[in-house]
Design a protein with these regions (language model features):
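Cytosolic, long alpha-helical scaffolding segments
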Residues: 1-216
Length: 216
């Protein structure tokens, strides 16, 4: 009985790694589309987001089977409950990468010019997503803590971009619609950073049994 349960736990681990890899792909693809002003790349984001949605349902069903059909001990319950939390954040990363791509597609023929700060923010966010997935793969608490700390950097980028864009709107320098679209894209990156942080916090819970909210 335990042998079968361990096999299913190993399957859960593999499925989460695959879903995490899809999240890395989708955010990298939407960011590349933004940087290169490439609508063909933006069109490839939605199918990946749909694949992430399917993976979320598959993992959720597997977790429910583990809970209902097996007899998990405390450490098993920790892994399963953390997995259920993580897939929610992973699914939202896919959604927000798709939201970025949708803005780019709606502006076909009127490409946005992403400034250096937004490109830096995109790179920082991609790194957070990648490292949160790596932290899960390696069950690495130190790396998870680095991801959590990096969220302040992404928030700082958002604050600077927001202040810059609001100033340009006030001065009538930019097209208002384009400026609002850039602000929305920056907000999506900020949210993706939040989801990567959540994933890292659940990795820490899975390994240590203590969630950040309980440690403060």
């Amino acid at each position: 009985m335990r042998s079968q349960f361990d096999k299913q736990l190993a399957q859960l681990h593999r499925e989460l790694i695959e879903m995490g890899a899809l999240c890395e792909q989708v955010i990298a693809l939407s960011s590349q589309a933004l940087t290169n002003r490439d609508t063909a790349l933006a069109e490839k984001v939605a199918p990946l987001d749909h694949e992430i949605d399917r993976k979320e349902r598959d993992i959720e069903n597997l977790c429910l089977r583990l809970l209902l059909q097996q007899q998990p001990v405390a450490s098993d319950l920790r892994q399963i409950s953390a997995a259920l939390k993580m897939i929610t954040d992973m699914e939202r990363i896919g959604d927000q990468a798709d939201d970025i791509a949708e803005i780019l597609l709606c502006r076909a023929g009127r490409p946005l010019s992403a400034g250096d700060t937004l490109r830096d923010m995109a790179r920082a966010t991609i790194r957070m997503v990648s490292e949160s997935v790596d932290a899960y793969v390696r069950q690495d608490v130190d790396l998870a803590q680095q991801v959590i700390a990096a969220d302040d950097e992404v928030d700082g980028y958002f604050d600077r971009i927001k202040a810059h864009l609001i100033d340009r709107i006030a001065k009538g320098v930019d097209d208002g619609e384009a400026t609002l679209d850039l602000l929305m894209i920056a907000k999506y990156y900020e949210r993706i950073g939040d989801h990567a942080t959540n994933i890292a916090e659940w990795v820490m819970f899975s390994v240590t049994g203590v969630h950040k909210t309980e440690a403060t």
